[in-house]
């Protein structure tokens, strides 16, 4: 399991990093690229899991105690470009650029997916 943001989302972290996304922090590409390279061709796809909390983001305790409010989950399987498992992120600048572009597109789609999920939840309440 890899969390590309590297940390939990908070409004303060979102402001500090000037994230271009509405619901996400900026992804950190290096760890994901390193993992794919280390695992070689063992992975052909990844599961992209988006979680939205229409009633507000719960604390860890609220999650653990079953008081998280509504939780929406969207899961999709995405193919991993085969060459992403064979290039060295730290030394190959062209690959690093391609990988950043791919992850940025994925994050833009993910941010829109969360926006759609929250809008859908709001429409159900209205």
What are these regions, as identified by a protein language model?
Residues 1-88:
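A cross-family acyltransferase "interaction/gating" segment
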Residues 86-126:
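Accessory terminal regions of nucleic-acid processing enzymes
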